[in-house]
Amino acid sequence: MKHDLLNTHFPTSHDIGNFLNEYEDYDIDSLRLKANNNPHWQLLIDQKQGQQTLSQRWPSLCQVPGYLLPPLSNARQASSEATATWKAHFLHQAIGSPASWKGLDTTGGSGVDTWAFEQCGANMTVTEPDEHLATMLHHNGQVLRQTRRVIQDKAESLQTGRFDAVFSDPSRLQNGQ
């Protein structure tokens, strides 16, 4: 049974800001070793590490209050904001530059490509088999006030849907498929 993406609770943007301020002078490794009862402790550490590491690659997204950055292991595989924007504009032009269009991202991952497509007017459906990433994609869609539909599964599970464009990141495909 798939996880209920709508009922997952994350720390608020206020909680994240407080954590970043309180632990500003701590290094990531020390924080990971520190025992803490906060159920979001590891996620908060990931946010600190993400802010330090990704602010150059994702300058716009790192500035959005409440936007959750993925774990660094996932973010390293993701497009930079500039690359994602280029791909989105290229795809948007290829389908005739409509003001609004339906897109499918079969390799949701960190969501930076999805975000870029949404900046070009796409109403996105995103598939992501990883529960944690799918939940973050859903949360971030709400933070960005996008009406994206997130499906925690592989794209092959889609039974219906008509899309103007389909995007698959080749670096995330398994065995080239």
Where does each model-flagged region fall?
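SAM-dependent transferase fold signal centered on methyltransferase-like domains
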Residues: 1-177
